[in-house]
């Protein structure tokens, strides 16, 4: 993962993306105007619905040319 930056703001889940090959969930979300997605087969995708509508601090980086959540914490 490259170009990792930290963003703080309200998390909004836009849509659930198709599951990975192994059946793990994936989400497209927005944090303070920055649209990003969860990485394939990442455990963060299981915790993301718990943060929906709440203030979070997230590390967002570029993975294969797409903005991807690297880590997330509740503020």
List each model region and its residues.
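Structural detector for short beta-strands of small beta-barrel domains
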Residues: 2-23
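N-terminal compositionally biased, intrinsically disordered segments and leader/signal-like regions
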Residues: 6-9, 36-41, 69
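Beta-strand secondary-structure signal
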Residues: 10, 26-28, 57-59
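OB-fold (S1/OB) nucleic-acid-binding surfaces
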Residues: 16-39
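Residue-level recognition of conserved beta-strand positions in structured domain cores
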Residues: 31, 39-40, 60, 71
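Short nucleic-acid-contacting surface segments enriched for D/E, G, S/T with interspersed K/R
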Residues: 42-59
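OB-fold/S1-family single-stranded nucleic acid-binding modules
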Residues: 59-75
């Amino acid at each position: 993962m490259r170009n990792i930056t930290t963003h703080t703001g309200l998390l909004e889940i836009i849509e659930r993306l198709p599951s990975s090959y192994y059946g793990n969930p994936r989400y497209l979300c927005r944090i303070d105007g920055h649209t990003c997605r969860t990485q394939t087969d990442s455990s963060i995708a299981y915790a993301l619905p718990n943060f929906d509508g709440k203030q979070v601090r997230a590390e967002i980086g570029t993975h294969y040319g797409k903005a991807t959540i690297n880590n997330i914490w509740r503020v």
